[in-house]
């Protein structure tokens, strides 16, 4: 805990700077930095993230006590620079209070504007500015925001709208008006009175009038918001540790709602949706910042180019656009020129795409925030590659700029062009976040989460989203909002999550109570299907067919760049030629796991497999296996051909035999009829296969050692397919993997069968195919005796699913009964079946690699469990010297990027 808890900034000076984000949060550090490089920023101060942790450890009263002196002095610092006084009716200073963690968490925590107003100060503000409407507009906004954030005024149930919005709608209805800026001073005064009455009625206390009491309430509310439900969920999604805490930034208010020469807006130095190098953003005249991001009013475009593009998307002609929806470039050309110059300066300074908030107060431009902007996966890759081409960053930085998991977004399906041509367009909104989404309509976040859990794909439809909707946005395939622009909460958060989003669709009328949405005359109910095109803003009736994405352009260039630096190769887990082909197009350099058992479940194959299981003698088993042989050979032929010239690691039969027989009465009757035996015979045989703990029973190499004819048949199928391919001019590279070895003698026995069978095939065919025999290290004993096992194994493949299961003693199938509790209580930080346990399982891997290579110097080692596509696990594999990781086809690019990052981070 540092002794200094508060850092001031203003007038070109600052006690902090950009590299202090851990202490000051991203917002506080960047406000300090902007001061230092000459960007106009209202003066203020930042309370450190350490105080947030102190707040939760020691409590509110203790924190207020230790902060009082520094906060009082810092308020005086703002008063001196602004030449006004906090709480003084004759010359009032108003403040904003905002959160700011070290990692950007847009909309997840709380903000209060116009703090310091009461019935006396508002009159002084009106007199000082000569603008009574502005003063009371600021006052009603403050009471509304403070009532929500600090005093907890929320809707009583989810179908109700915000209690303050209900009052606003009532006043507008009485006056026959639609827009906030049409309200008179008398209307605004009525709102303040009614807001205060509602607060007194719902929470039982009067609205606080003392400005310092208001300030402490706001500071504590921001700290408290670090632990609100949506912030916790967002941290979990983004991997942000709880102990980081949030800073609190207090600033002098500058006002975008002082009249027609004032405005507020949000802008990006590049397109956060597609990554294009185009300055873009939105603004509202005579408004405050929260109006833009909350989506309460659909704002106008900052640039002329952006405005014309918006008009084209919305079907607005040029004359109407110019008169009713002009760009800032047209209406405030001098301010626009300053804004454009500063956004360019900030991007050049930070060498990354910037997301900026600004206010224009009576013709003067102020910056309230800059941060590295949230972006889609597509934009992430394009921006990194463009900055590299422009010389702003080097190759290593470009690789490190990309988040491996966000590459997943580039691999999502896209709408099929033929299906789109047939689809019925209902309306068009703003293309807030690209992607293709189809699903059933839901209106509430909790319903979206529940429907998703039940296996439904959903589209969440809202008037506008708020941070409370995060859980629903996470569960939904896409989001549609009636209000809000390209910089609204829905748009920013959707882009950050890689979710398809269409915002500000004017033809959409949502009725929460009836759970209906009317779209240009078509009424749809909860559960009806809807499709969204986040790249064009089009909304379609029903479901629209999709097709797989392709690796092209900047993505392909990034992957090529990764290959330049990576040492760890990436294979795929694939059981069919189709999966193998997909993985190969994504850059896989072989198959790290081909599971033979997955091939047995088709009709004719499962029948032959069951015949083998029912057999009582070796002769009968061999007859059944002869029936299976051509099927297996055909399967291996397809995969080896698809991966021509690349290694294909084929695991011999692994699961216990009971998995191949039916356990229900109906299935057993059908099997008896098919096999021409009695139901009782089937029942007895199934019962005889039953084990108390089948995952530790007769499976893996134990099957092959108990029934060696199974291993012999599979070897014949693998090498028979390889020989056929070699005769046809191909270059098959089979690897035969013996699973679940715990003792070197188990492998010794299996290797002898494989080699003997191979020699017979090669002699009979007159052709030899080079192949390797290896083992899966998935039992702790195998890892600890790896030096012995390496005397027989030509390679190791770590089966981290079972190795994790046996090291922890956790059943992968049953962990759900206690995992949520373990994660909540911090007994476990992560699910060890998703993220490799480096302290335990990882040490077994490290030991096995070291011991194995003492026996066999050039021993090839890889992993093929689910961890092979998880970025932190991939980086661990690089550090312990593995040759490759293997993962599902669609995780291959993610693993390639993570492997390159591991190599770059080591340089």
Whereabouts are the PLM-identified features?
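Nucleotide/phosphate-binding sheet-loop regions of phosphoryl- and nucleotidyl-transfer enzymes
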Residues: 1-423, 431, 450, 456-459, ...
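Conserved alpha/beta-domain cores
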Residues: 98-99, 551, 561-907
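S4-like RNA-binding module at protein N-termini
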Residues: 507-540, 545
């Amino acid at each position: 805990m540092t002794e200094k808890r508060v850092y001031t900034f203003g007038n070109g000076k600052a006690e902090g700077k950009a590299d202090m984000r851990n202490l000051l949060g991203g917002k506080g550090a960047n406000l300090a930095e902007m001061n230092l490089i000459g960007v106009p920023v209202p003066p203020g101060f930042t309370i450190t993230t350490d105080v947030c942790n102190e707040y939760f450890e020691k409590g509110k009263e203790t924190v207020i006590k230790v902060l009082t002196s520094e906060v009082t002095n810092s308020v005086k610092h703002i008063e001196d620079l602004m030449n006004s006084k906090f709480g003084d009716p004759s010359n009032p200073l108003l403040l904003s209070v905002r959160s700011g963690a070290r990692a950007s968490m847009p909309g997840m925590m709380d903000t209060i504007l116009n703090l310091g107003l009461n019935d006396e100060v508002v009159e002084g503000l009106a007199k000082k500015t000569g603008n009574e409407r502005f003063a009371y507009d600021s006052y009603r906004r403050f009471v509304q925001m403070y009532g929500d954030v600090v005093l907890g005024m929320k809707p009583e149930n989810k179908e109700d709208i915000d209690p303050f919005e209900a009052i606003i709608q009532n006043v507008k209805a009485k006056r026959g008006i639609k827009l906030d800026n049409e309200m008179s001073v008398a209307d605004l005064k009525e709102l303040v009175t009614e807001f205060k009455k509602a607060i007194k009625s719902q929470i039982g206390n009067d609205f606080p009038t003392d400005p310092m009491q208001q300030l402490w309430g706001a500071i504590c509310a921001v700290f408290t918001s670090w632990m609100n439900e949506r912030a916790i969920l967002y941290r979990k999604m983004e991997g942000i540790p709880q102990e980081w805490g949030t800073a609190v930034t207090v600033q002098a208010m500058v006002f975008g709602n002082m009249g027609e020469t004032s405005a507020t807006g949000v802008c990006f130095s590049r397109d956060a949706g597609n990554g294009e190098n185009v300055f873009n953003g939105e603004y509202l005249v005579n408004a405050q910042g929260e109006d833009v991001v909350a989506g309460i009013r659909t704002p106008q475009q900052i640039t002329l180019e952006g405005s014309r593009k918006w008009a084209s998307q919305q079907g607005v002609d040029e004359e109407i656009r110019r008169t009713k929806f002009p760009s800032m470039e047209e209406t405030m050309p001098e301010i626009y020129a300053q804004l454009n110059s500063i956004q360019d300066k900030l991007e050049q300074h930070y060498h990354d795409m910037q997301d900026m908030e600004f206010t224009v107060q009576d013709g003067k431009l102020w910056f309230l925030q800059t941060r590295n902007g949230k972006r889609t996966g597509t934009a992430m890759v394009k921006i990194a590659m463009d900055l590299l081409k422009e010389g702003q960053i080097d190759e290593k930085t470009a690789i490190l700029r990309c988040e491996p998991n966000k590459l997943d977004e580039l691999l999502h399906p896209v709408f099929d062009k033929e299906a789109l041509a047939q689809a019925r367009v209902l309306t068009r909104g703003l293309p807030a976040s690209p992607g293709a989404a189809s699903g059933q309509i839901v209106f509430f976040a909790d319903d979206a989460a529940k429907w998703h859990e039940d296996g439904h794909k959903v589209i969440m439809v809202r008037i506008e989203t708020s941070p409370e909707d995060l859980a629903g946005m996470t569960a939904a395939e896409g989001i549609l909002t009636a209000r809000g622009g390209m910089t609204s909460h829905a748009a920013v958060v959707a882009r950050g999550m890689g979710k398809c989003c269409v915002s500000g669709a004017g033809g959409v009328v949502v009725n929460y109570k009836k759970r209906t949405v009317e779209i240009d005359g078509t009424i749809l109910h909860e559960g009806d299907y809807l499709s969204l095109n986040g790249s064009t803003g089009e909304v379609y009736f029903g479901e629209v067919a999709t097709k797989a994405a392709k690796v092209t352009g900047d993505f392909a260039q990034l992957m090529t760049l990764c290959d330049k630096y990576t040492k760890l190769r990436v294979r795929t887990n694939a059981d069919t030629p189709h999966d193998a082909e997909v993985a190969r197009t994504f850059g896989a350099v072989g198959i790290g796991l081909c599971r033979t058992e997955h091939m047995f479940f088709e009709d004719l194959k499962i029948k032959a497999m069951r015949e083998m299981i029912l057999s009582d003698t070796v002769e009968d088993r061999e007859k059944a296996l002869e029936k299976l042989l051509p099927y297996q050979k055909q399967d291996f032929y397809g995969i080896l051909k698809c991966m021509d010239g690349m290694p294909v690691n084929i695991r011999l039969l692994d699961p216990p035999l009971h998995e191949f027989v039916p356990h229900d009465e109906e299935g057993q009757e059908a099997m008896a009829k098919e096999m021409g035996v009695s139901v009782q015979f089937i029942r007895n045989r199934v019962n005889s296969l039953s084990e108390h703990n089948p995952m530790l029973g007769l499976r893996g190499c134990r099957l092959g050692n108990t029934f060696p004819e199974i291993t012999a048949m599979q070897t014949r199928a693998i090498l028979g397919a390889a020989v056929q391919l070699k005769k046809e001019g191909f270059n098959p590279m089979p690897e035969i993997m013996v699973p679940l070895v715990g003792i070197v003698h188990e492998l010794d026995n299996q290797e002898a069968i494989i080699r003997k069978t191979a020699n017979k095939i090669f002699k009979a065919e007159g052709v030899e195919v080079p192949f390797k025999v290896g083992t899966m290290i998935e039992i702790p004993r195998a890892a600890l005796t790896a030096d012995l096992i390496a005397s027989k194994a030509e390679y190791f493949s770590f089966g981290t699913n079972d190795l994790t299961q046996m090291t922890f003693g956790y059943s992968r199938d049953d962990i759900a009964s206690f995992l949520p509790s373990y994660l909540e209580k911090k007994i476990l930080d992560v699910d060890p079946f998703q993220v490799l346990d480096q302290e335990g399982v990882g040490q077994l891997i490290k030991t096995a690699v070291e011991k194995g290579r003492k026996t066999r110097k050039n021993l090839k080692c890889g992993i093929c469990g689910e961890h092979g596509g998880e970025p932190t696990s991939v980086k661990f594999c690089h550090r312990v010297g593995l040759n490759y990781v293997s993962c599902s086809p669609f995780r291959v690019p993610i693993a390639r990027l993570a492997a390159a990052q591991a190599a770059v981070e080591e340089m």
